[in-house]
A protein has these predicted regions:
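Non-globular, low-confidence helical/coil segments that flank catalytic cores
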Residues: 1-254
Length: 254
């Protein structure tokens, strides 16, 4: 597997199969003294990893927090089984939280297989307006798998939050009814101690504007850039509000 980024938060550590040495980006933390900074970094690095896995122009994010497992999206339909195989290589047997940012195939492509292959404790996605509900088999297979496995499923709404021990995940969007599937994307802010991430799915500029208008604190350390870096996302105002130290784009050759 080519891993776009494995952020092991002791700084931020990115590595891939072609460059096993990787490189370390320091100073992700702000602390009042070097000793506090060093201790905080050590504690967080032992607790939290965020894997941005290269699945082409699609999204698959695996989060390891202590002994808990979280996934956000599940790639496209191909390459076959890339998501389940990757999770098995990480010794995952149970998924505490599975998230679908929105129902496009390049985000839900292998979610049905994940649900069938692992014990999924909780599943969340956003509400899809009736006019935008997908009619393809991929979406139907995911819903069928959720029903067959009796997964605790929930429509997540802006303003809600989920906590796993002292890891907090806040739902910032969608704030309003999206006019297209991209603007139904769940936008999630994940915070652990003094480190934060923003996961944006394929949220476009309209949803970004709604989130800004809602008054959320968008400042984070790491941004998962919306819609694979497309010009339809990442408005200048949004990027100023987020002001990340690092950004990750999931993209493949066109």
């Amino acid at each position: 597997y080519l891993i776009v980024g494995v952020i092991v938060l002791a700084g931020a550590f990115f590595s891939n199969c072609e460059n096993t040495e990787g490189f370390r980006i320091k100073n992700i933390f702000n602390s009042s003294s070097p000793s506090n900074k060093e201790e905080t970094s050590k504690n967080i690095s032992e607790d939290l990893q965020v894997h941005f896995v290269d699945v082409g122009k699609a999204d698959f994010i695996y989060i390891k927090f202590k002994n808990h497992n979280i996934i956000i999206d599940a790639a496209d339909k191909e390459p076959n089984n890339i998501v389940t195989e990757y999770l098995k290589k990480q010794d995952v047997s149970k998924i505490d939280l599975a998230v679908v940012s929105h129902a496009h195939r390049d985000h839900i492509g292998q979610m049905a297989e994940v649900i069938k292959s692992f014990s999924v404790e909780k599943f969340i996605m956003s509400k899809i307006p009736e006019s935008l509900i997908p009619t393809g088999r991929t979406y139907e297979k995911m819903l069928r798998a959720l029903k067959e496995k009796e997964v605790n499923s929930k429509i997540a709404k802006a303003g809600e939050s989920f906590e796993i021990e002292d890891l907090k995940i806040e739902v910032l969007g969608p704030v309003k009814k999206g006019k297209n599937l991209n603007d139904t994307s769940l936008v999630l802010k994940m915070t652990y101690k003094n480190v934060s991430f923003l996961f944006t799915g394929d949220a476009e500029k309209a949803e970004e504007s709604d989130i800004i208008d809602a008054g959320y604190n968008l400042k984070v350390d790491v941004l998962k850039v919306g819609h694979h870096g497309s010009r339809t996302s990442s408005s200048e105002n949004f990027l100023k509000k987020v002001s990340p130290k690092f950004a990750v784009i999931s993209v493949g050759p066109d």
